[in-house]
């Protein structure tokens, strides 16, 4: 078992667990904690090789990242939790809900996919090659530029600088490992197995990570699932429009089955 950095906030009885994406760490969810801490116990953690979590060499898989989450929940004796994940974190959350339905109270995959496709894979193969040849610093700026809308980038340079620092906390092993997992993503045919109450959330201006039309299609494969789009937000919707995202988040999580 790897050493995993995690943080618990809040004083409520029900758990909600946030799952990060590629080159993110648990600080990406800082803007969501105040909206939930009165009513929920909030668990955030770093994927292996990201932030403060231990890295291992070699390719990772989505199944391995699901096992990491299961091990953490077991260690903390969290029997059931709602899951919120963004990007690769959304894929991990979907996979966890498929493999461990008894542990998931509600599911909110954000700005994500359930299957890798050739054109998207080509972009990630190019990013991996750049990192291998030039190091992680070479993809920091292209990543920041891809994650947010032009309007947001112009108005919030201080947020972009925080994001750059977050990306730089990712290890080379962690980046290569989780991108390999992402390239192997193939969950779409199993989405009908999801039993948890599910809300798919996209950023209205997300063109690549989890475009609204793609996420609407995913929601149609899960019994009873819905899709909503956060206005004025691109890929990292929870940071670009925290008010809009948090309204959807709190409305969804506070409803019980």
Predicted feature descriptions by range:
Residues 8-58:
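Conserved HGGG/HGGXW glycine-rich cap/lid loop of the alpha/beta-hydrolase fold
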Residues 64-81:
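Conserved acidic catalytic loop of the alpha/beta-hydrolase fold
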Residues 94-99, 104-135:
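Flexible "cap/lid" loop of the alpha/beta hydrolase fold
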Residues 118-122, 134-192:
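Conserved alpha/beta-hydrolase catalytic His-Asp/Glu region
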Residues 194, 200-202:
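Short beta-strand/loop motif that positions the catalytic acidic residue
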Residues 196, 211-219:
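Short alpha-helix in the alpha/beta-hydrolase fold that links the catalytic acid
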Residues 205-209:
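Acidic catalytic loop of the alpha/beta-hydrolase fold
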Residues 225-257:
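Catalytic active-site module of serine/aspartate enzymes centered on a nucleophile-bearing elbow/loop
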